[in-house]
């Protein structure tokens, strides 16, 4: 995950951890990949719900995937829609929420819009044109980074470089 998204995760995680039971709606199949990046093993996930009928009955995060239409009969006090750009998915299941349940989604941890090229489709590959550089600063050796603004060649304006150093 991106370091900024990682920095936003604790607030959502705390909100989920405070719940009695979470219904996880894995509409796009992101839940297991997300769980590999963010530790969710100790969250009170009461059930996993899917829309794709081919996934019903499969194991997702140790739970037998149930059809999203069964969501209303869960005892969850929060439904986590495990996707980005979740407005449409959330509106499609709003009538299925258990009584009194609130909804959460991964949009709560997304990068700020000013860092995105395509703000309408968060997971568009253009938003994550990422390069990694490993720097050395020891024993008289140093790394120098030189770059070029190739985005201008594609018509981009106001291009910025964002870096985060880890020590």
Region locations from a protein language model:
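Hydrophobic, well-ordered beta-alpha structural blocks that scaffold small-molecule cofactor pockets
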Residues: 1-131, 135-137, 148
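Contiguous beta-strand segments within globular domains
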Residues: 139-144
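Extended intrinsically disordered, low-complexity coil regions enriched in Ser, Thr, Gly, Ala
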Residues: 147-167
């Amino acid at each position: 995950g991106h370091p900024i998204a990682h920095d936003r995760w604790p607030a959502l995680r705390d909100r989920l951890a405070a719940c009695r039971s979470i219904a996880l709606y894995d509409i796009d199949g992101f839940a297991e990949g997300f769980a590999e990046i963010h530790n969710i093993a100790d969250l009170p996930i009461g059930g996993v719900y899917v829309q794709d009928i081919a996934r019903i009955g499969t194991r997702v995060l140790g739970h037998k995937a149930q059809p999203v239409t069964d969501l209303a009969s869960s005892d969850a006090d929060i439904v986590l829609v495990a996707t980005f750009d979740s407005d449409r998915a959330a509106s499609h299941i709003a009538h299925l929420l258990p009584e009194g349940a609130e909804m959460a989604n991964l949009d709560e941890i997304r990068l700020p819009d000013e860092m995105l090229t395509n703000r309408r489709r968060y997971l568009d590959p253009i938003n994550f044109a990422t390069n990694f550089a490993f720097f050395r600063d020891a024993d008289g050796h140093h790394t120098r980074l030189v770059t070029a603004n190739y985005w201008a060649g594609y018509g981009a304006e106001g291009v910025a470089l964002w870096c985060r150093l880890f020590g």
